[in-house]
Amino acid sequence: MAPSPPVIHVLGAGPTGALTALALGLQGQRVVLFDPLTASELQARSRAYAITHSSRRLLTNLGLWHDLRDALVPFRDLDLRDGATNARVLFGQDDLASANRDHDGIGWILDHRPLMKLLLARLEANGNVAMHLAEPCPDPSADALIVAADGPRSPTREAWGIRHWGIRYRQGCLTAKVALRAVSYTHLRAHET
């Protein structure tokens, strides 16, 4: 009889950890998912994500894309500008690989809350994933594989002495959430010219 594979411990139930745990669980792997936050706290972050076509394929393969469609806002153009050189690059649907042109945009904006709500529901429903939210991480067995997905300032990485490096490239991005009520598309277009 073949030994059963070890349980995989995923530390961190944000988008990266939750997607990892779901992907492993869907493959039949036993997973223990830990996060010190509650489900409500995990969903409460005020942030949005730019979803690319590679992310779309991942979400499709995990069975999430269809259920996120109402929360996805497509963008069909991307205007990149360099203030130092006054250079400008415009991306549109024609710049995509042909396999990606039949979709609604060159990318999508997805709010954090609907993504996390769906991920947590799917994880809860997956019999291969044991969620431990807002409680101490269970002690992994000696042969457990541990995935540290506990953020950019990972306490796991720090505790294990795993070194890392980064490059400050002095670029930034400003995003804002704007609620539009009773404003027509033609009215918005008139102000763009």
Where are these regions (language model features)?
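A general structural signal for well-ordered alpha-helical segments in protein cores
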Residues: 52, 56, 115-116, 171, ...
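A conserved short coil-to-beta-strand element within the FAD-binding core of flavoproteins
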Residues: 133-140
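A conserved beta-strand/loop capping segment in the N-terminal third of enzymes
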Residues: 58-115
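N-terminal Rossmann-like FAD-binding beta1-loop-alpha1 element of flavoenzymes
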Residues: 8-32
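Glycine-rich FAD pyrophosphate-binding loop
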Residues: 26-45
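Helical element adjacent to the flavin cofactor pocket in flavoenzyme catalytic cores
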Residues: 110-132
